Amino acid sequence: MAEQVTKSVLFVCLGNICRSPIAEAVFRKLVTDQNVSDNWVIDSSAVSDWNVGRSPDPRAVSCLRHHGINTAHKARQITKEDFATFDYILCMDESNLRDLNRKGNQVKNCRAKIELLGSYDPQKQLIIEDPYYGNDSDFEAVYQQCVRCCRAFLEKVR
């Protein structure tokens, strides 16, 4: 039997309390359900340092629980080491992408492929909008988009 290679993905948004923790939790469930979780290192982080150490937004936690998913994530800011250790850094919008490309260019041994998670959306919704100032239906929309994108991403890279 061929040895499985471990892959790694880091989901990133502005504050790491809404979109990226949802994406991380969705992807964890997908790889667990497909019995490939041992092949993956999965995390999420923020571009900013605003929420370091905080739990995800209660609306994000509620949305995930509604779908039978739990998360114990605590927000953290992306580090230079992340660019050198993760295979994929998947972000939510163009502002994240600009910030990550700028930071990644400052890391000599950047190996991460930095992309928009929405680039994997079969419905072609490139941007995953921040639901922070929205309501429960906005969080549900983020969840559904993350499910579509994470499924397509996993299919492409496995």
From Swiss-Prot:
Keyword hit for Phosphoprotein: yes
Coiled coil (UniProt feature): none
Activity regulation, per record: Inhibited by sulfhydryl reagents.
Catalysis performed (reactions): O-phospho-L-tyrosyl-[protein] + H2O = L-tyrosyl-[protein] + phosphate; a phosphate monoester + H2O = an alcohol + phosphate
GO molecular function list: acid phosphatase activity; non-membrane spanning protein tyrosine phosphatase activity; protein tyrosine phosphatase activity
Uppermost EC category: hydrolase
Its EC number(s): 3.1.3.48, 3.1.3.2
Alphabetic keyword roster: Acetylation, Cytoplasm, Hydrolase, Phosphoprotein, Protein phosphatase
PTMs per UniProt: Phosphorylated by LCK. Phosphorylation at Tyr-132 increases its phosphatase activity.
Subcellular location: Cytoplasm
Active site residues according to the UniProt entry: 13 (nucleophile), 19, 130 (proton donor)
UniProt KW Hydrolase keyword: yes
Modified residues (Phosphotyrosine): 132-133
Gene Ontology CC entries for this record: cytoplasm
List of residues that carry N-acetylalanine: 2
UniProt xrefs under Pfam families: LMWPc (PF01451)
Protein role: Acts on tyrosine phosphorylated proteins, low-MW aryl phosphates and natural and synthetic acyl phosphates with differences in substrate specificity between isoform 1 and isoform 2.
Known partners and oligomeric status: Interacts with EPHA2; dephosphorylates EPHA2. Interacts with EPHB1. Interacts with the SH3 domain of SPTAN1.
Family statement: Belongs to the low molecular weight phosphotyrosine protein phosphatase family.
UniProt name for this protein: Low molecular weight phosphotyrosine protein phosphatase
Species of origin: Sus scrofa (Pig)
Organism taxonomic ancestry: Eukaryota, Metazoa, Chordata, Craniata, Vertebrata
This protein's encoding gene: ACP1
